[in-house]
Every structure is written in C-alpha cells, then in structure tokens.
Regions:
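Bacterial N-terminal signal peptides
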Residues: 14-24
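Bacterial N-terminal signal peptides that target proteins for export
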Residues: 2-15
Length: 396
C-alpha cells in the first residue's frame, strides 16, 4: 500500500523548482487554469477499473496566456472522477487552489471510499502545501468568487459549504442546506451577488443570494433537463449554461442506456428573476460546459456513447466537442469536432480563442481552436500522469 504522505512529500520536493518559477511570475497577464487528475481510476472500454500500483492523484496548474499553454506546477492531492468535472477552483491571484471529490480505493474490499474534506493547496509555498478542511460531507462542485474571498462547495448531502478565504487561510463559515439529495456544479454570477447550484437528483437549479459574504437560499428554482450537472456563467453578466446529463446521472439508475441525446439549458441572468430560456439538444452525457469570456460561444464536451461498453449499440469510440454561438438570445449550433473517449471538463482560455478539453481515458489535455465558429482540433496535447477529471479557470 502506498503512503500518500510520503509520496506527496517526494513529489512536492521534486516540483519545488517549478513552484519558484511560478513565484517569479505575477498573476498579471497570466491565464491560470487548474486540472484535477485521478491517477487510480482507468476506464477500459466503458468499464470501471482500478489497476494495482496506481499513480497518485494530482492537481496541475497551467498558464494559458500563450499558446500552447504551459504546465507550471503539479502537486499530489486526493481527487476522483466521480461527480461533475468542476471539483477544483483557483483564486484570482493563483495563490490558493481548492480541490474536492477526494476519493480512495480500498483494494482489499474492492470499494471506493469518499472523504468529506476540501483540500487547500497553497501554490505560493515552496514546495506547495496541501491542507485539509473537513466540511462534513463529500464535496463535488467548487466555485470561488471574483473577489477571491468567498468559496462555495456543493455536497452530496444537499448542503452548500460556505468557505471564507483570507490570504492562504481557508475556513468553514457556514453550511446551507438547500436539498435532500446530491448537488453537483456551482458557479457565481459575474457580479458576485448570486450563485447557481445544480440540484442533480431533485432536478432544477437553485439560486442563492450573496450579500457581503452571507449566503442564503433565495427560494427561486430554475428549470433544467434531467440531472443538471455542470454550470458556467458568462463574464458579461448575461448568461448561464447548465449541462444536463440525463438518466445516467441519476442515483443507482438500473436501466440500460444506449447513448440517448441529452441537453444543455441556457439561462438569462441579465436581470432578476433569472429564467431558463432554452433547452438545446446535445449528444449524450454532456459532462462539461463552458461559456467564452467574451460571451459569444458555448462549448460542450459530450461523451456521445464513448463511455459505453463495446456490446452496446450506442457505443462510439470518441465523444464530441460541440460549439454553439449565442445569437439574439438563443444558442445556435455552429460546429463540432471529434473529442476524446469518455472525456470530462471543458474551459475557454481567457482570450476566448481556444477550448481546453480533458481527455480522461487518454490522460491528456486537448486544445481546440474556436476560429470564429469553425472548431478545429489543434493537435496540441499535454500528457498527464492521471486521467483529468475536473477543470476550472480563475474567476472571470
């Protein structure tokens, strides 16, 4: 059995030089993005496996201000693929990263264990320091506001953990119960006055009020498709988008699925009350969704049957990356390209020119050019030691 603490120490020491390089840079001009990577899990033709002698889970820090993006830091953490690919977050100054979805695999019992802490990664320490903050339930989606002082964590028990950030110190301020079952993704609105939370098992999207660090449930619920999962909000303050992963995202669903189409929900957040205005059909299991910082594009990463076993008629070898334009208040499909096998998260670079997609099975980050609405795989890849499973940019 590997010793997580010993391995974490060795990895941190080896990466000290990289951390110093980051310390030499300022956040000005950088485009910081974090990827959480599951080293213990491997999907093999649609089947979950946990190979012996796994590599550690990791957090990778990228600077995407130039193309191709560059890896600046990698540090060992505890992170799993189970849940929405938004279980990481990073402060605007890139000093602190938060990591959720902590999982361990018990090889003797052949059972996955889920922990109830958020990891606080001090990226400015040399080597990086990882601390744990218990929040009482298994954390899924994480979001940090643009001030860098407040974070929200959506949990599997239906609660939202409210975290305060002061320098490199993170504390649990409050726990807000908004549902009885699992939550998934969470995102702040651009002005920081609200947050949207995906009610994965109970359906719909909850709207929270945020006032000077105090978070309350507004009581407003927005329509979604089945099993709302990931959420992103545009930097122009106009739109939010939610991926709805369908029956496959419901708890203990026992039926056989053959890659049915799912959908993405477009929400108008330009004025209150917020309102869902469109449900757009996409290929099955849209794990990741993102809105470009300039508010023009929506990127969707859909598995499209690439998560299914070879005997399933809905099986495809690769998923799809789909691009929509936002025109006259509606999302219009303009392009698509082959993606990875059972891929996960997706994010735009700060200049809105590229999409970063997590190719989980291939253990790669892939880069697609938006090209004015003509999606193109650049062929650029960043190899990772584990399957990438969560992806977030700094708050924009």
């Amino acid at each position: 059995m590997r010793s997580p603490n010993a391995k974490r120490t060795r990895c941190a020491q080896a990466l000290a030089g990289l951390t110093i390089a980051v310390l030499a840079c300022t956040s000005y001009g950088a485009d910081w993005i974090v990827s959480g990577n599951d080293g213990k899990y491997q999907r093999v033709e649609g089947r979950d496996t946990y190979p012996d002698n796994p590599k550690p889970d990791t957090l990778t820090l990228l600077d995407a201000s130039r193309f191709p993006p560059q890896v600046k830091v990698q540090v060992e953490v505890e992170n799993g693929i189970q849940g929405p690919p938004q279980a990481v977050a990073i402060t605007p100054d890139a000093n602190i990263a938060l990591v959720g979805a902590p999982t361990r695999y018990d090889y003797a019992a052949k059972k996955l264990l889920m922990d109830s802490f958020v990891q606080v990664v001090d990226l400015q320490a040399s080597p990086p320091v990882v601390a744990r903050l218990d929040i009482g339930s298994h954390p899924q989606g994480i979001a940090i506001d643009r001030s860098g002082r407040l974070a929200l964590v959506a949990c599997v028990d239906g609660s939202v953990a409210v975290l305060g950030i002061d320098g490199n110190r993170v504390t649990l301020r409050d726990t807000l119960k908004i549902a009885q079952k699992r939550l998934a993704g969470v995102s702040f609105t651009h002005d920081g006055r609200h947050a949207l939370v995906a009610l994965r098992d109970e359906q719909g999207v909850a709207v929270l009020n945020v006032d000077d660090g105090r978070v309350t449930d507004s009581g407003l619920r927005l329509a979604s498709g089945v099993a709302p999962y990931t959420i992103d909000v545009s930097s122009d303050g106009k739109w939010a988008v939610v991926s709805d992963v369908g029956l496959a995202g419901l708890p203990s669903y026992a039926g056989k699925l053959a890659g049915d189409a799912d959908d993405v929900t477009l929400i108008d957040v330009s004025h209150e009350p917020f309102r869902a205005v469109q449900h757009v059909t996409v290929p099955s299991l849209p794990e990741g969704v993102a809105i470009s910082p300039d508010g023009k594009w929506i990127g969707v990463q859909a598995m499209d049957g690439s998560n299914l076993t070879p005997d399933n008629p809905g099986r495809h070898a690769r998923g799809k990356v789909v691009l929509f334009a936002i025109r006259d208040g509606q999302a219009v499909k303009v392009s698509e390209a082959p993606g990875g096998e059972a891929a996960q998260g997706i994010a735009f670079t700060a200049d809105s020119k590229y999409l970063i997609v997590q190719f989980n099975v291939e253990k790669q980050l892939a880069f697609f050019a938006v090209n004015g609405g003509h999606l193109r795989d650049t062929g650029q890849r960043i190899a990772l030691s584990g399957g990438p499973s969560s992806l977030r940019t700094t708050p924009r």
